[in-house]
């Protein structure tokens, strides 16, 4: 059996839903049909992708690997279909936006959309890959993050604008974890926990490893994407670093890390300053809107966490031009 796009959609639906029953309902198929399809996919790939339990399904290590590759492929396929249909219909002008994961995306795209201009979105866990696509003319702008201590490779001909010089990274842990009872968590409180990181995100593993090593921790580490990490946190299997704008859920808690030991720089990249000027205000508004919707991040901001930055161009890693803007 050859793997097809519909098979990848089924796998992602199972992972997101947490059970075959819920995934089948979302896909509009019978559960036995989905179960049979999953078995055939597993046979084609050479091993089990999910463990079946009474409470639902969880990805196996092989499943996490497959899901980590499947999600960006599905995003690319959806973008291809959408852009092809628009081109066939003589559609509106397109603004090609690239981004690493961010809760600001929905608000940003909503603000950019207007008569005669329809933004398209291409997601990628690799900030360096997105920057290369801007340079190559495949994207108009890209919103990326740079893990401190892990400089991005910024092409010479790009211009960048800094949205936030240092966004602190928080931790997502099970809601019933003893440390979740406090608003600020020390890394020592998580010494016995397994951590999950996504090694495909530029700089994430190095940044997390350096943060843990600085306080003498050498925990067990699992590799997987953000969606898998969130589901495993909910079941009490792991803890993970997360963006401060992440929302707590009934089964998970988002908390600040004591001393803010890990941060990222948020950058917008384009080939010209005019392109930056055209989209940056909408991104800025969307980011702070998302930031204040998170209780933990809002409290951190109200405590004076973000520094005021002067506007001034400086040389970026690799020679691109970076502009700082005043934080709100």
UniProtKB/Swiss-Prot annotation:
GO terms for biological process: regulation of DNA-templated transcription. One of its GO terms (molecular function) is DNA-binding transcription factor activity. Residues 1-60 form the HTH lysR-type domain. The keyword Transcription regulation applies. Keywords: DNA-binding, Transcription, Transcription regulation. Residues 20-39 bind DNA. Transmembrane segments: none annotated. The keyword Zinc does not apply. PROSITE patterns: HTH_LYSR (PS50931). GO terms for cellular component: protein-DNA complex. It comes from the Bacteria. Belongs to the LysR transcriptional regulatory family. Transcriptional trans-activator of the gene (mprA) for the small neutral protease. This is Small neutral protease regulatory protein. It comes from Streptomyces coelicolor (strain ATCC BAA-471 / A3(2) / M145). The gene is mprR.
